[in-house]
C-alpha cells in the first residue's frame, strides 16, 4: 500500500457524465482517483476535502481504449474510478452546480 500524504493527490477529478450526474440525487458521487489508492484512503480523502460522512466506496479499474492513429495504434490512459455513497443526512457535495 502506497502512502499518499495529501488527500488532493488521491482524488484527481469528478466524473462528468449523464450517469454520474443522475446519481447525485441519490447522494452517490463518482471520482477519478489515483491508481494506487485503496478504498480506505479514498474515504478519508473525501471526508477531509468535502467535510461529509461517507457511507461506502466502490472502485472500478477501467482499461484505456485502443485507438487507431495514422501510423498504427495508440492507447488511452487507464483510469481508476471511485463511486462514493454519502451517509444519509449528509450535506450534498456541490461539484458542478447540481440541484440538491
UniProtKB/Swiss-Prot annotation:
<dbReference type="InterPro" id="IPR012677">
    <property type="entry name" value="Nucleotide-bd_a/b_plait_sf"/>
</dbReference>
<keyword id="KW-0694">RNA-binding</keyword>
<protein>
    <recommendedName>
        <fullName>Large ribosomal subunit protein uL23</fullName>
    </recommendedName>
</protein>
<keyword id="KW-0689">Ribosomal protein</keyword>
<comment type="similarity">
    <text>Belongs to the universal ribosomal protein uL23 family.</text>
</comment>
<comment type="function">
    <text>One of the early assembly proteins it binds 23S rRNA. One of the proteins that surrounds the polypeptide exit tunnel on the outside of the ribosome. Forms the main docking site for trigger factor binding to the ribosome.</text>
</comment>
<dbReference type="GO" id="GO:0003735">
    <property type="term" value="F:structural constituent of ribosome"/>
</dbReference>
<dbReference type="InterPro" id="IPR013025">
    <property type="entry name" value="Ribosomal_uL23-like"/>
</dbReference>
<dbReference type="InterPro" id="IPR001014">
    <property type="entry name" value="Ribosomal_uL23_CS"/>
</dbReference>
<dbReference type="Pfam" id="PF00276">
    <property type="entry name" value="Ribosomal_L23"/>
</dbReference>
<keyword id="KW-0699">rRNA-binding</keyword>
<dbReference type="GO" id="GO:0006412">
    <property type="term" value="P:translation"/>
</dbReference>
<dbReference type="InterPro" id="IPR012678">
    <property type="entry name" value="Ribosomal_uL23/eL15/eS24_sf"/>
</dbReference>
<dbReference type="GO" id="GO:1990904">
    <property type="term" value="C:ribonucleoprotein complex"/>
</dbReference>
<dbReference type="GO" id="GO:0019843">
    <property type="term" value="F:rRNA binding"/>
</dbReference>
<dbReference type="GO" id="GO:0005840">
    <property type="term" value="C:ribosome"/>
</dbReference>
<comment type="subunit">
    <text>Part of the 50S ribosomal subunit. Contacts protein L29, and trigger factor when it is bound to the ribosome.</text>
</comment>
<keyword id="KW-0687">Ribonucleoprotein</keyword>
